[in-house]
């Protein structure tokens, strides 16, 4: 069915309040969009970080009288009479199909493919991870996930134990298992991530070799041959004492979620205990790898 879209421009600080106003005026969904395509850096715990200049977009049923909507919004103290906005009629499309059409199998390194469930597997002889795009957790499309997958693909993981610190969807742990690891351990602070990882592991037939823990439940003295953490630079620095003890002596460490401009400070946090490799960059992001001394 067709829809009507109303777009407001505001500051990040006011975006949530205007989102509520749009919903009260009859919007069926809300989208926040960066006005200037600038990156959002890591939020503080409990904080919803938005851009300084944010578009708030409300989607309305095609039968909605937008004059009434505008009249309601004009009563809001952040808007007032004659507030700037843009109303656009959206053409009737199969939005779910269009969304699905945007996702294709992706290759990482020499052996590894990440494939949505509705696509044909390009190479039956390759290492194929079946993973559908989701709203919250990694699916391989972000440069940091790509950097980690390429790194794992280049390792000999046969018989190894791998820890995925901040596992999200479980994509890195599952890829490691598919690439030959004997066991993987996923750790995440979000119970929804633990469930997503469990579901994806079952879908890929590796759930019997994947252990999943919230930090409070993880075993003491846990060790692995390979540790990968695709989180953010701030947590990587703060958690360096914890992450650094996870690899065995001579074990490998892979870190991402790091902007290139943050690489030096993250390297400094790990240099004492690891022999670090040259930093690898992709777009504005980078990967740091090393071996435990």
Curated annotation (Swiss-Prot):
Catalysed reaction(s) here are: L-lysyl-[protein] + 3 S-adenosyl-L-methionine = N(6),N(6),N(6)-trimethyl-L-lysyl-[protein] + 3 S-adenosyl-L-homocysteine + 3 H(+)
**Any single biological process term in GO:** methylation
Which domain of life does this protein belong to? Bacteria
* A Gene Ontology term for the protein's cellular component: cytosol
Q: Where does S-adenosyl-L-methionine bind?
A: 145, 166, 188, 230
What is its EC class? Answer: transferase
Chief localization: cytoplasm
- One Pfam entry name: PrmA
Cell compartment(s), UniProt: Cytoplasm
Q: Give the protein family.
A: Belongs to the methyltransferase superfamily. PrmA family.
Summarize the protein's role.
Methylates ribosomal protein L11.
Please give the name of this protein: Ribosomal protein L11 methyltransferase
- Origin organism of this chain? Salmonella heidelberg (strain SL476)
